[in-house]
């Protein structure tokens, strides 16, 4: 197969996954945005975590809220728990890598805050512990997952929201996660500041 054909095949796979996800995920993305808006209106904040590419997604989400998405508006409170290398490495060294997010959540999380927990498999041990810590702090969890939802899905409470991408290929799940994050940012802005359309 020549390279351009391979590229077209990858684009097509991404398009098909997004089309399937659009039908399945729209109500869950809407619900998650409402949970986030409610928290923000009640002086809550967003905490976000993930590993690898999902760590990048957590930072992307928090930067869109702290700075701006597609319009000028006041900054919104969001913290990516993936950015402080001194904190992360000290927790990993002194305790366990599985606690790098949960210890931060226990210190920073407050009742009514929202945790955006991102894992393509749903089985990342440190994300599972983060969800448990968020529940201990009476936070609501929005989980971005894929495949069968993994261990994360079984931990979620009725007030939590799972946005589970209907795919098994990690790259396709990540692509939909980013689109879902952009949808969340757009819906948060439109609910808080009005629609620009």
Swiss-Prot record:
Keywords: Carbohydrate metabolism, Cytoplasm, Isomerase, Metal-binding, Zinc. GO terms for cellular component: cytoplasm. Residues 36-197 form the SIS domain. Catalyzes the isomerization of sedoheptulose 7-phosphate in D-glycero-D-manno-heptose 7-phosphate. Its EC number is 5.3.1.28. It comes from Pseudomonas syringae pv. syringae (strain B728a). Belongs to the SIS family. GmhA subfamily. Zn(2+) binds at residues 60, 64, 174, 182. Homotetramer. This is Phosphoheptose isomerase. The gene is gmhA. One of its GO terms (biological process) is carbohydrate metabolic process. Substrate binds at residues 51-53, 64, 93-94, 119-121, 124, 174. InterPro entries: GmhA/DiaA, Phosphoheptose_Isoase, SIS_dom, SIS_dom_sf, SIS_GmhA/DiaA_subfam. Pathway: Carbohydrate biosynthesis; D-glycero-D-manno-heptose 7-phosphate biosynthesis; D-glycero-alpha-D-manno-heptose 7-phosphate and D-glycero-beta-D-manno-heptose 7-phosphate from sedoheptulose 7-phosphate: step 1/1. Binds 1 zinc ion per subunit. It is found in: Cytoplasm. It catalyses: 2 D-sedoheptulose 7-phosphate = D-glycero-alpha-D-manno-heptose 7-phosphate + D-glycero-beta-D-manno-heptose 7-phosphate. The keyword Transmembrane does not apply. HAMAP family: GmhA (MF_00067).
């Amino acid at each position: 197969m020549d390279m351009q054909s391979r590229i077209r095949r990858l684009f097509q796979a991404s398009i098909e996954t997004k089309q399937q996800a659009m039908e399945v995920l729209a109500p869950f993305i809407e619900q998650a945005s409402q949970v986030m808006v409610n928290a923000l209106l009640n002086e809550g904040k967003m905490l976000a975590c993930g590993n690898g590419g999902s760590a990048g997604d957590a930072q992307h989400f928090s930067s869109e809220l702290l700075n701006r998405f597609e319009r000028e508006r006041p900054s919104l409170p969001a913290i990516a728990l993936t950015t402080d290398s001194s904190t992360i490495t000290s927790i990993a060294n002194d305790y366990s890598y599985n606690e790098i997010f949960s210890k931060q959540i226990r210190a920073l999380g407050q009742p009514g805050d929202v945790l955006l927990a991102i894992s393509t498999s749903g089985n990342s041990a440190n994300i599972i512990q983060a969800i448990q810590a968020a529940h201990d702090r009476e936070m609501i969890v929005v989980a971005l997952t894929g495949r069968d939802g993994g261990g994360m899905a079984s931990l979620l409470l009725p007030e939590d929201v799972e946005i589970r991408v209907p795919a098994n290929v990690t790259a396709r799940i990540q692509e939909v996660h980013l689109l879902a994050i952009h949808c969340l940012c757009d819906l948060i802005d439109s609910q808080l500041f009005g629609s620009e359309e």
